[in-house]
Structure formats: structure tokens, C-alpha cells
Amino acid sequence: MTTDQPVISLRPGGGGGGPRGGRLFAPAFAVAASGSGDFLRPHGGGAFRALQDWCLHLSHERVRYSRDQLLDLRKITDVTEQILRLQQEIEAELHGDDQSWVRNDSNVQLQTQTQTQVQAQNRFTETDNRDWRARTEKPPAPAVPEEKSWDNIREVKEQYNASGRQQEQFNRQDQSSSQKAQVGPPPALIKADVPWSARRGNLSEKDRVLKTVKGILNKLTPEKFDLLKGELLDSGITTADILKDVISLIFEKAVFEPTFCPMYAQLCSELNDNLPKFPSEEPGGKEITFKRVLLNNCQEAFEGADSLRVEIASLTGPDQEMEKRDKERIFKLRTLGNIRLIGELLKQKMVPEKIVHHIVKELLGSDKKACPDEEHVEAICQFFNTIGKQLDENPKSRRINDTYFVHLRELVANPQLTPRSKFMVRDLIDLRSNNWVPRRAEIKAKTISEIHTEAEKNLGLRPGATANMRNGRNAPGGPLSPGGFSVNRPGTGGMMPGMPGSRKMPGMPGLDNDNWEVQRSRSMPRGDPLRNQGSLINKVSSINKPSPINPRLLPQGTGALIGKSALLGTGGPPSRPSSITASPTPLPAQTTASPKPSSATPASVPIPDKAASSAKVIPAGLEKKTASLLEEYFGIRILDEAQQCIEELQSPDYHPEIVKEAINLALDKGASFVDPLVKLLEHLYTKKTFKTEDLENGCLLYGSLLEDIGIDLPKAPTQFGEVIARLILSCGLRFEAVEGILKAMEDTFFRKAIFTSVTKTLEADPAGQAILSSHAAVVDACNSLSI
């Protein structure tokens, strides 16, 4: 067995004993094996031979080196340039292809590393004359500083932050200065010839008025009409120039907001009646009035449509397509809006009918065989939808309308007419054949009260239920009952209104003499529904008519209360006795017996024969006709037409109910309808359609209902007192009737509110002061009722 020769390994894996070492280092040490070993001993071969001597005796056991041997090794630590090249080749072979990029720059890196190694060799080749055996004592450890307080730490932190901010500021200044040096000074600002300014306090009188008018028109709604109308009259329209600009603003608003055209037409009528006339700018010319300037604007807009149409047709370029569409849309809005405004002005008696016929002839054209433009056909349909009913009321205009509609029927058969226009013309013909009653409700501007009333009808709620929601009476939450009140509300006694301990709430069902539930409505007085209130027990049955209930809104299991019944035969509570109807003369008070226990067959309420004989039956459908004509009057406010409709009813015994319904509807709509209400009642009294007894009984009817109505309409007592006072001033109502109206209600709060409003309105007029002084006894009696 041969013994392996000890070979010193200067690198990992070196030596000749292993396959790795032979593969990697055999080529690299081939030079040394050939006998040229001077590259390992630059300082001579003596030291190297000594190293070889002790390496020959080296075994595989642990080797211990003496101090002298280590010092001998230090003498051969100089690394030559050839060894460094070998190092690079070995590392490249170890790392493989990943380090192939190193070889491309091997020359540059080799030079850099060579310089670094030479500097390190120069430092280590110097003779070290220090005494390694002598040990110097370590310097004493510095004393441990005392623990820093939080204040000291905070001060150091603040100083550090301050220095950082200063350094950042200096860097920013240096950066900005360098940028300025590179870019140069910023460009100078270009000032406009006429710079914008707020011009506060420098407005002219005309600009100030126009600015005020614009603000008023932007806030104008049917509910705020009366208030803003007064502000517009007081805005300062003092010259003809200002008047023309104001009319232009109103015209533009009305044209682009056709839904509000009725409101703007009414505004124009009010301004025409109240604004002054101005002298003509030309000698011998006509006066400048609101009506003349407004009609000139309408005429110019109507006649200028052809020039706009030609201008739009000239836009044929591909880049003008968007502009053409915008102008077509604006042209259509202006045309239809102008036609709608002219129609509404006709309703306000500001446009004569001859102008209307001239417009229709212009739109239809003289040639019956030619097909009008689509815009003209749509304008004709819009025109007749607005004023067709009013034109047909005049026999002469109706004959002219017949010729128009003959032309329209021929137009439907024209193949050149577009399908859309054909359907519009057919709808117009059907509308006239149906007496101008539309199939769908017309979309128009409404007040908040009208919106709530419509919602109550659609949902089957008790009248005024939405007012309770607005006032927060259902704040605790929970489902709503058909009367508009919370089912889970404390104190209501649950779902069953007749349970013991339940509170009587407005709108809850009452009980008749046989313990049958009777659904109460706003028109029913408080207490027992069969209990008389003076002369009120004999009034129209609509007072006691239950309000409709939508069965879909009721909880499950309650359908039997309002559905078909084997006992009743019909849905709902039992009908009231037929003898309880409207009567022109009050009946004596009747006492009601105590409630009888409920039985399978409800007993009829005994009514005296005298009451049955004196009762008169009201024609069916009279209530709906009354509500319809009152709604129409408050919409158009034409007194003669309202008078004609009431006279056509031919029911003088129903006049007190009409008075009551008129007051109820007007006060429910708001304070702006008090004046039209008083004008209507005064007009009907002056024309002898209504008598003094009709007005007194109607006010008495409404006064008996005010305790229920006042819950939803807190201002109703004050407004009702104003109506009474104004009727007294017009001699339509006797002052003694005030005492009877106050006695019809039990709540002293409502009595006081009504009488205070009556006296306040009368004291503001000299004639009213004379009435109060001449009826001192009645005033004292009314004061005692209000305490």
C-alpha cells in the first residue's frame, strides 16, 4: 500500500487527492508541476523549500503550526498577476454560463482588481516592527450616561426635524435656482383687454332690475306664485326699455319650459293688469304696453321659424352634423313652446281668436293636397290640445274648427305624412270626438298639496294622511293602517279600532247605533257618525260617505271586513238610511239611543216621518260634477264659466254643499287660493246664483268639519276666518252667522283662531269697523265662546 503524499491546498477543493481537485486544478497547476515554481516564491526559494520540508511530514491528522512557521508563511503572501488570472478562470468555471458576461469585461475588471491587490500588497509587505507579545491595557469604559428624560428626547427630535426641514428647503432652493438657470425666466402673463370683474355695486338700474327678475323667474312655482308675483311687480319696472327686456326674459322661460306655460300665461295676465303703460318712443305712436310687446315677441318667433329652418338646412358638412342636431332641437322646442304659450294666453283673454285662426291656417297651408311639414303638423296638434275645448264652446269658432278637422282627416290619408304625424292627428281627432276628455291625465305643474292629494287617491289613504307623515306623526315607525296611522302606535289599541282602551284618532272607523263600523272621512264630524250637529244631519250623503280603501294596503286576514258578505250583500259598511240626505231647511236636533248589542241582522235606524217626508234626493253623480267644476275653476279662474257650470247642475238644494266643497278645496290647496275662492262666492252671490242662506249653511258645514281638517291644515282656521270676513264685507254673509259657525265646533282653540281672523280682517277696512261697532252684542257673545 502506498501512502498518499501530503500536498498543501491553498484553495477549496485543491490538492490532487480528489476528482474535483484534479479536474479543476490540474490544468491550472500544470505549470507548477513542470518544475517552474518560481511564480510562487518571488522572494527566493529558501523559504519555499522550508515549507516543502515540513509539508512532506504532514499527515492526515490535525496539523498544529508553530509561531515561526506562521511567520515564514507571511513572507510568501505576495499574489502575482498570474495567480489573479487563474482565480478569474476558476470562478468562471465554477459558476458556469451564468457568469459568461464577466469574461467579456474581464480585462477591465482584471485591471481594477490588480490595482486593488497591488495596493493591499504594498501595505502588507512592509515590515511589522510592533511588539505582538506586549499587551496594552484597554482604555477604561466610558461612564454610562444617565437615562434621558422625555423632554430631552423631544428636544433632540425637534432639533433633528428642524435641521431636516432647513436642509430640504436649501435643496429645494438650489433645485429651483438650477432650473431657472436652465429654463430662463417665466413667460409674462397676457392680460385681457376687458378683464372680468364682479362689478359689485356698479350695476346700472336696468341691470339691477333684470338680475332681480331672473332670480324671481328661477324660483317661480305654482305654490309660490302669489308671493313672487308681488316681488316681480315691485322689482322696479319703470321704463319701456326695462319692460321690453323683462318680457323677453319671461318669453324665453315660457318657451323652453312648456310644462309651466299656464303659470307663465297667468303671470303675464297679472303683469298686464298691474304694470303701467309707457309713452311711445315715436311721435304719434301707440302706447307701449305689456300685452303689445309680448304679442310682438310671439309673432316674431312664429314668423322667424322659416328663416331658422333655412339656416339649419344649409348645414350640410360632415363636421356640422352635431351643430345641426342642436339647432334642430332648439328650433323644435321654440316652435312648440311658442304655440303652447299663445294657446295659454288665449285662455287668459290676452290673444284674440282671429290670431289663433290665422296661425292654424298658416300651419295647415292653403293647398289641401300638399303635405305640411312634420313640425307644422305637430304644432297644430299641440295647439288644438291646448285650446280646442275653448274654441268649440263658441258656436262660430266651432263651425270653423269643423273645416280644420275635415282637412286633418284628409291629411291622415296622405301617403307623404310620416307615421308618427298620422298617429298624432288621429289622437287629436279622437280627443275632439270624446268632448276633449283625454285618455290620460295631462302632465302639468302641480303644487305640493295637489301632489299629496293625488298620492292619497292612488294609494287609497285617508285624506290628509300624507300631512301626518310630513308632520312626523308616524315617527315611531311601524306599518300604516288604511287611515294613514301607524298600526303599532301606542294607544290605538291594536288593529281592531273598537277594542276596549283604544283611543279615538282622526280617521278611525266609528260605530253606528248597531255597533257597525263606519269608516270616517275628513267630511264627517267628530263623535258618533249618526249624531246630529244642528242642521247638518240632513245634508248631502257625501258628508258621511266613507273614503275608499285599497284592500291591497290592508294586512292579511282583514279582507272580510270590506269584502263581500253574506249578511250585507255588498262590500264595506252598511249604507246610511236614504232619508239622511240634503235638506234646504235644518231639522230639529234628534237624540240618539244608546248602542244596541250587535246582532246577526243590523236593525235600521228609526227616522221620524217628518224628516223622511221633507228629505229630497240628490241626483247621482252630483258630487263628482261639483269637484270637477271646482278643480277646473281653480285652474283657469274664469268666473262666468264656473257660474254657467253651477247653473247647469240645476240643484239649488245642493248649493250649500258646493260652498262647503269650494272652501274645503281652496284651503287645502293653500293660501294663494283664498282670493279666487272669495271672488267666486262673491260673483255667484252678485249674480243671484247663491243666496245668503246658501253661503251661511255652506260655512256652517265647513265649520263643523274644521276640528278634523285643522289637524292636517293648521292654517285653515285663520284662512276660514278671512273668508268669512270678506263675505261679510261683500254683504253676502250676515255678521250674526259668525256666532252660529263658532257654536258648530267644540274646540275653543279653533273658535278663537277663526274669530280673531274675522275681527282682524274687518278692522283693516272702514266698513268692517262700522260693522263691528254696530254688532257689539254679537261680538261679546263670540268672545265668550272663544274663552
From Swiss-Prot:
Cellular component, GO annotation: eukaryotic translation initiation factor 4F complex
Molecular function, one GO term: mRNA binding
Superkingdom: Eukaryota
Composition bias, Low complexity: 112-121, 588-604
Disulfide bonds: none
Pfam families: MA3, MIF4G
Basic and acidic residues bias locations: 125-138, 145-158
Domain MIF4G residue range list: 210-435
Protein name: Eukaryotic translation initiation factor isoform 4G-2
Organism name: Triticum aestivum (Wheat)
